[in-house]
């Protein structure tokens, strides 16, 4: 976070540090470590960098991380078959299919093939439903990371007016759910919102996750607002976010830079979810054995 008192490296101290402690406890108690398998399809530069960072931080804290790489033209059925095999593999605690996918592969079908217990991204419909219903759930990593960063700056979010720019299933909607659970008044904006600037001007918290370079300007933000920039946009001047950092940083109480703001926290939350998936899989297999249940080809109970 870039705040009035300078940069605080919360993503490493509070994010990875906490995951490391839990991973050490698991290794001590179960004589094994959580396993994360990532499926990477194609040669998208941003995806390759992101996956490389996941591998690096996994190794740092002792999570067993593997990457399965496929070319851009891989058949959808091969990807689905791989996921089914990973569902049945007891060594694999968490499964992640790196997005975006090639157009010929059905994203929703891929997401729904992953066991909810192994869904580290929190995208499976069961996890989405649990989150929206207020039940325990795997929470999508980027919104979860944004939420934890928010709590570093503002412990009590109750009654705050939050504007979420973007309504995607991956970021905008789950972010809104997390804010609602904290008793924020939440406004979700999108491409059809008539006066986005005025909506932002009223906000105590702005979450920008729409993919438009430097959309949010300084005169959109009120004094001492908290601004979280999820956007990653490639421009002639380099990588920029959805927020004009130079302008907004002069006004906001706290703002995340791009790159280097939300990204590291997203990875920390991914690894945290991997640890939680390890625990879920232990409960799942234990319950299934107790009840005399088997599994189908997708790894689900029958």
Tell me what each language-model feature is.
Residues 97-157, 175:
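Anion-binding alpha/beta catalytic cores of soluble intermediary-metabolism enzymes, centered on
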Residues 58-72, 186:
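Short beta-strand elements in bilobed, periplasmic/extracellular small-molecule ligand-binding domains
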Residues 46-55, 140-216, 220:
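Glycine-rich phosphate/diphosphate-binding loop of Rossmann-like nucleotide-binding domains
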Residues 42, 66-76, 191-193:
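Short beta->alpha junction loops
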Residues 1-20, 284-302:
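Single conserved hydrophobic/aromatic residue that forms the stacking wall/gate
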Residues 188-280:
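Rossmann-like adenosine-cofactor binding region
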């Amino acid at each position: 976070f870039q705040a009035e008192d300078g940069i605080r490296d919360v993503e490493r101290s509070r994010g990875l540090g906490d995951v490391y402690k839990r991973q050490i406890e698991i290794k001590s108690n179960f004589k094994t470590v959580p396993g994360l398998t990532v499926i990477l399809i194609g040669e998208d530069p941003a995806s390759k960098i992101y996956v490389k960072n996941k591998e690096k931080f996994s190794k740092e804290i002792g999570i067993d991380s593997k990457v399965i790489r496929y070319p851009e033209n891989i058949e959808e059925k091969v990807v689905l078959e791989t996921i089914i095999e990973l569902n049945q593999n007891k060594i694999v605690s968490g499964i992640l299919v790196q997005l975006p996918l090639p157009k010929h592969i059905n994203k929703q079908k891929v997401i729904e093939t992953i066991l909810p217990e192994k869904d580290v991204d929190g995208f499976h419909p069961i996890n989405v439903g649990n989150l929206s219903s207020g039940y325990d759930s795997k929470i999508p990593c980027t919104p979860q990371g944004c939420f934890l960063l928010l709590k570093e700056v503002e412990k009590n979010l109750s009654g705050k007016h939050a504007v979420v720019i973007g309504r995607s299933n991956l970021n905008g909607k789950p972010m809104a759910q997390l804010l609602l659970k904290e008793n924020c008044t939440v406004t979700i904006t999108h491409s059809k919102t008539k006066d986005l600037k005025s909506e932002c001007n009223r906000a105590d918290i702005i979450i920008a996750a729409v993919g438009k370079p430097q959309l949010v300007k300084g005169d959109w933000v009120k004094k001492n607002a908290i601004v979280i920039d999820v956007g990653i946009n490639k421009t002639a001047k380099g990588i920029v976010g959805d927020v004009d950092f130079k302008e907004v940083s002069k006004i906001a109480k706290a703002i995340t830079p791009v790159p280097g703001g939300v990204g590291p926290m997203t990875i920390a939350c991914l690894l945290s979810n991997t640890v939680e998936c390890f625990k879920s899989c232990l409960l799942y297999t234990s319950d299934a054995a107790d009840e005399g249940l088997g599994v189908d080809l997708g790894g689900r109970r029958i």
